[in-house]
Amino acid sequence: VLEDNITTTSLVLVPRQIKDKEKVAKDLSDILGTSYEDMLAHVSKKTSIERVHPEGRRLSYETSDKINALNYDGVYLLKESKRYYPYKELLSHTLGYVGIDNQGLSGLELIYDEYLKGEDGSIKYFSDGKGNRLEMAQVYENPTDGITIGLTIDLNLQKAVEGALDEIVSKYTPEHALILAMDPQSGEILAMGSRPGFDPNNYKDYDTETINRNLPIWMTYEPGSTFKIITLASSIEEKTIDLFKDTFTDSGSINVEGATLHCWKHGGHGTQTYLEVVENSCNPGFVSMGQKLGTQKLMSYIKSFGFGKKTGIDLNGESNGILFNINKMGPVETATTAFGQGIS
């Protein structure tokens, strides 16, 4: 269970039932650590029921016991549910967090708020002019539980991802880090995490940017060499290369319209088959693949693989990604796109 509800208590006042308003205000303000003037305003309200926000919401057991011990008329403790995240920072950006009334504010909490929150129960009864409950018929409506949502997340893998992120941050102190693990057959997300992270149990302790930016979803970045598989798959499908028979000679760089694009290996890989181009992750070799495909076909396959548009994942903040405008692409843009640069 990645998140659950726990029972907590909140302070509710019935001002008409409170006889010594000054004393009640003094004692409650002392217990809650709020000002006497503010509490006196609460107990003096001309309302049938008064909630004390936010000091009187989701009280600790110790605070609740102190209020109970006062045994004042018109002072009640109402049981409420509070969302609890037992794993704290684990998967926090994906799960999201809720506000004081358990309304979803980000992540899955926001997307599925309507289904998770359920419906409150209620008791309807008659009272006299002083707010005293009358012994007459009452109507009780049962509460309805929210649904339980199952995720594709592998908890053990997620724990490994969180540990790896912490190690990366400790070793390299980057501004941010992110890891995403996906099932290549189904597209299901198996693990996803980023740093900086936050504990949704105490989300108010963090700045807005930290708690609301789910970096694997929100951020755009160049895929780099991981993108080469797209160029390779497109070339195989179009039969523009023979992996085993065709060769490419890498001198360490390739000139495209006056632009020099370098291989990661100084001096290059020499003559190699295109299978070896793949094995060596040779940038000039992939430029050659892109040239053989041509701009139109390369971009067509890139779009068919889903780049440049949202996946439709059920998380807020997903970006479209960025592609070159095909009508403005020249040989250099085609070349860099072929090995994963200039695309995000």
Where do the model's predicted regions map?
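Beta-lactam-recognizing serine transpeptidase/beta-lactamase-like catalytic domain environment
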Residues: 128-138, 179-225, 230-344
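Short N-terminal helix-loop-first-beta-strand/juxtamembrane motif that initiates sensory/input modules
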Residues: 73-77, 170-184
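Extracytoplasmic/secreted envelope proteins and their assembly/folding machinery
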Residues: 8, 21-29, 64, 68, ...
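Envelope-exposed proteins and targeting segments
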Residues: 7-11, 73, 88-93, 108, ...
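Conserved, well-ordered alpha-helix/loop/beta-strand core segments that scaffold catalytic motifs
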Residues: 134-177
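A short, polar/charged loop-to-alpha-helix boundary motif
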Residues: 8-25, 197-213
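Solvent-exposed coil/turn segments that connect beta secondary-structure elements
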Residues: 6-7, 14-18, 58, 80-82, ...
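Small/polar-residue-rich segments within soluble enzyme cores
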Residues: 6, 22-30, 41-146, 340
